[in-house]
Regions:
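Extracytoplasmic
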Residues: 11-39, 43, 152, 235-240, ...
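C-terminal membrane-cytosol helix-exit motif in multi-pass small-molecule transporters
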Residues: 180-200, 470-478
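Conserved MFS/SLC helix-loop-helix module at the cytosolic interface between two early adjacent transmembrane helices
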Residues: 63-101
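C-terminal ends and interior cores of transmembrane alpha-helices
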Residues: 86-99, 291-307, 384-387
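Glycine-rich segments within core transmembrane alpha-helices of 12-TM secondary carriers
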Residues: 135-160, 432-442
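Extracytoplasmic gate region of multi-pass secondary transporters
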Residues: 30-34, 216-268, 300-304, 409, ...
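Cytoplasmic helix-loop-helix junction between adjacent transmembrane helices
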Residues: 107-144
Length: 489
């Protein structure tokens, strides 16, 4: 770390953030591209195949974050970042020639290395700034997560343009070529303008560099990051098919809504860094995990239209049914009024309904001339419950959740320079690995949950459980170490 920030520090921060934004945009391309190809039946892929193709790039990027962080600590960020950008451009370009699931998966595995750029940028940014600015600067760098929003916002429009609005589906192959060119251009810019710098620990052996991984705190931070980053990555992709299938949106519109989730989450990360510097990461994380638990719980209830047996009418005495109408049943002079089906549910989708709506009515089950006994059913009750899961309310909650996770991402990484100032690359890489694994496993888990339950909201059930476990683990850990804590945990 430097004692003071300089103009060179700010230049490196800008280049790191720019390169990370480009890499993150590439990393998230399958969320849009795979959904587009499956929706338009270019390839016959179901939810599980889609989940795997979304997860494979994230897996690659996650696994290689640790070695990327170690290489950055050893050789500095410039050579590692430049090599990564050029290498990843190759499989990104080859994706344009993929014709089946296997070739798509192999190319996705290759360009997924762009996800390792996070560990490089974290370590390379950290060495240029003093400890007091670590939260803010790492938060600014992390705003490169907004690259996901750039993909979900612009890639659907580009796909429509290249395919002539679906009349030439082979035109999709142009999109990977454009993304590959972006990586090459970014690599050239980084090579020409970045300056290299190594941390003081660069002379350590590889084994010595890995020693912090014995500390349980590293794994706990990684578990938090599994939620706030891994799930952010997962939903940056999963929300596109979510909006398409649940709210019947065109893919371009779904991409815009997904971008509204991912863009604020990326940009607000800088605010999370500032908040962590000012108030302490512990307080911020309490708020993040508690709010994540609450919002996830609120999103669990699915969009539904349920019919259930309600309060019926039974005969008070035996007799012959003399008249049956929509409003009344007459049994030898004994009249039984019926609740008529209301018109409450007409044009419900044109309204904004926050809570479930109910209507109740009764329908005759007897006919004129029929003999009925005492307590025999004359009319059955019907209860209809409709929950709109209004798209605007859903979108607001999802955007709020994404923004909260964005602040949480910065809060998690605020801990690392404080506890491991000379091993930021290794520890940051390992935490990034665990967080990135969330981005890999979650779309796959979502796919299996969807297959098993038939409910798209099953993913929010998983988020609720995960958020609650993180909150409990953090609280128990803080209680155990509070007498030794200095305010950062």
């Amino acid at each position: 770390m430097q004692k003071e920030a300089t103009a060179t520090s700010h230049k490196i921060l800008f280049l790191n953030t720019l390169a990370f934004t480009a890499c993150f945009a590439v990393w998230m391309i399958n969320g849009v591209l795979v959904t587009y190809l499956a929706t338009n039946q270019v390839f016959d892929w179901g939810p599980i195949e889609i989940g795997w193709l979304m997860g494979i790039p994230v897996l690659t990027g996650s696994i290689f974050r640790l070695p990327a962080g170690m290489l950055t600590d050893k050789f500095g960020g410039k050579p590692v970042f430049v090599i990564l950008l050029f290498i990843c451009a190759v499989p990104m370009f080859l994706l344009s020639y993929a014709n089946d699931f296997i070739s798509f998966a192999l190319c996705s595995f290759g360009f997924g290395l762009t996800g390792a750029s996070f560990a490089i940028g974290i370590a390379f940014t950290s060495v240029w700034y003093p400890r007091k600015l670590q939260g803010t600067t790492l938060g600014i760098f992390g705003a490169g997560n907004a690259g996901a929003a750039l993909t979900t916002l612009f890639a659907p429009t580009l796909l429509n343009t290249y395919t002539a609005n679906g009349t030439n589906m082979e035109g999709w192959r142009m999109l990977p070529k454009v993304y590959a060119a972006m990586l090459v251009i970014m690599g050239i810019i980084f090579f020409l303008f970045a300056e290299n710098k190594k941390p003081a620990s660069s002379n350590k052996t590889w084994v010595k560099m890995l020693s912090p991984l014995k500390n349980i705190r590293v794994w706990r931070f990684g578990f938090y990051y599994f939620l706030v980053f891994g799930c952010f990555v997962a939903f940056s992709q999963w929300l596109v098919p979510y909006f398409v299938n649940v709210y019947y949106m065109p893919i371009v519109t779904a991409g815009i809504f997904a971008a509204l989730f991912s863009f604020p989450s990326g940009v607000i990360r800088a605010l999370g860094g500032w908040m962590s510097d000012k108030h302490g990461a512990r307080k911020v994380m309490y708020w993040i995990l508690g709010t994540s638990t609450l919002i996830s719980f609120m999103l669990i209830v699915p969009k539904m239209d349920i019919y259930s047996p309600g309060k019926g009418i039974m005969a008070q005495r035996s007799g012959i049914v003399t008249r049956v109408s929509e409003t009344e049943i007459d049994v030898e002079g004994k009249k039984y009024p019926l609740q008529v089906k209301p018109t409450t549910f007409e044009n419900l989708d044109d309204q904004v309904l926050v809570f479930p709506t109910k209507e109740v009515w009764q329908e005759s089950v007897v006919t004129e001339g029929q003999k009925v006994l005492k307590k025999e059913l004359l009319a059955k009750g019907v209860t209809r419950i409709y929950f709109q899961a209004n798209v605007w309310i859903f979108a607001v909650l999802v955007i709020l959740l994404g923004s909260i996770w964005g602040i949480g991402k910065a809060a998690v990484y605020k801990h690392i320079p404080d506890y491991f100032p000379e091993e930021v690359g290794v520890v940051g890489g390992m935490v990034g690995v665990l967080g990135g694994l969330g981005g890999f496993f979650c779309p796959i888990i979502f796919g299996y949950l969807l297959e098993g339950t038939g409910l798209y909201t099953s993913c929010w059930m998983f988020m609720f459980i995960l958020s609650f476990v993180c909150l409990v683990w953090m609280h128990r850990s803080i209680m155990k170490t509070s007498k030794f804590s200095s305010g950062l945990e």
